[in-house]
Design a protein with these regions (language model features):
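Active-site catalytic microenvironments in core metabolic enzymes, especially phosphate/sugar-handling
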Residues: 1-278
Length: 278
């Protein structure tokens, strides 16, 4: 099976609308490196095709990495600005040495994978499944980002997330002793959606589990809420740590999508954080 056929199979299996029709010339889902007109010897799914992931894919005999995020550290994966960059040169050399093709799968997997007669967001369904929270989803069940869980404290929830997701640690903003039943996994907290997230939290969420967190917007709001006795907390997990389970979940449906028995495995890009505590 050619790599191009793997890619076409996955795209055909998924939905085709992510805030509008997914168009081949504008989608994030592009081949970021390598040829597609060669036989696929194996597939590795991951969130970020880091240098270590590339090495592990090669060691497993895989020549196709399907990643969720960009390869070269910027939106759109532009490389014109990287002329002379030593890290870019070294990563490019590693890719060439290992004979790896990298395809980004972002828009299609978010737009939906078939499950129980409907399309569900493959990334956030993967997170819900990893956490064992499928039965706790409220709101939009096709994009599980709102949950009502058995009551716990924010600190206990943070410890659960660290263990279940295999993290090095995490951070809590607000009241670590706050009682938590309702949890929101918001979209990016990088300015654009911060006010909307603050409004949603005020309307009935005890705790945020965030991909990013902006210190001067949502973090300040949660801290003030806690200091004013409103029992709010935010657990800062990290973008890749939140979305990576969806790429592991992909292994469940990938064989159906490509209709062939190609060796496939998941390699975690892993928690990027190392924590130094007082």
């Amino acid at each position: 099976m050619l790599i191009s056929e793997v890619i076409d199979g996955v795209k055909a299996y998924c939905g085709h609308d992510w805030g509008g029709p997914i168009m081949d010339d504008t989608t994030r889902d592009q081949v970021l490196w390598g040829p597609v007109d060669v036989g696929c010897t194996g597939i590795v799914t991951t969130c970020f095709a880091s240098a270590d992931v590339i090495r592990q894919a090669h060691a497993r005999g895989a020549n196709l990495i399907i990643c969720h995020e960009a390869l070269f550290w910027n939106h759109g994966d532009h490389t014109c600005w990287l002329a002379g960059n030593k890290t870019f040169a070294a990563k490019r050399a590693l890719l060439e040495e290992c004979g790896i093709t990298v395809w980004r799968l972002h828009d299609h997997i978010h737009s939906g994978i078939p499950e129980d007669g409907r399309l569900v967001d493959g990334i956030f369904m993967g997170l819900a499944d990893k956490l064992g929270w499928r039965d706790y989803v409220r709101g939009d069940t096709a994009r599980p980002m709102e949950f009502e869980i058995p009551e716990t404290s924010a600190g206990e929830l943070a410890r659960f997330l660290v263990g279940r997701l295999g993290l090095a640690g995490t951070r809590i903003v607000g009241d670590a002793d706050a009682r938590v039943r309702t949890v929101l996994v918001p979209m990016h907290l990088i300015g654009q959606f911060d006010n909307a997230t603050t409004t949603r939290m005020d309307s009935g969420f005890d705790c945020l589990v965030t991909m990013e967190a902006t210190d001067f917007t949502t973090s300040e709001y949660v801290r003030d809420s806690a200091q004013l006795g409103l029992g709010k907390a935010m657990i800062c997990i990290g973008h890749f740590n939140v979305e990576e389970p969806g790429m592991e979940y992909m292994l469940r449906w990938l064989p159906r999508a490509i209709g062939a028995d190609v060796p496939a495995s998941f390699v975690a890009s892993g928690d990027p954080w190392t924590y130094v505590t007082a």
